């Protein structure tokens, strides 16, 4: 299991800015996974940081990326299944 803070970050992108925002997010080492999705949000990212303080700094940095209209974050408190397998405690 990874150490630190894991966060699912939903991202709303301004029209015509998806490629630019995606490129900026891909450059951040804390962005572990990045998915383009349907629905209310345009992108979903999995973030991994060492601490909640680092997560706060990262979200402020992400929110300043040109083309990002808004974000919603969910801190992962417990993983039940990963890579198709149950995770035993």
Regions found by a protein language model. Name each.
Residues 1-89:
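A compositional/biophysical signature of low hydrophobicity enriched in polar/charged and small residues
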């Amino acid at each position: 299991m990874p150490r630190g803070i894991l966060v699912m970050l939903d991202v709303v992108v301004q029209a015509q800015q998806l490629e630019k925002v995606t490129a900026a997010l891909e450059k951040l080492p804390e962005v572990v996974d990045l998915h383009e999705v349907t629905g209310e949000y345009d992108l979903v990212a999995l973030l991994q940081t060492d601490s909640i303080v680092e997560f706060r700094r990262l979200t402020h940095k992400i929110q300043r990326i040109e083309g990002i209209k808004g974000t919603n974050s969910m801190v992962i408190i417990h993983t039940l299944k990963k890579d198709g397998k149950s995770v035993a405690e």
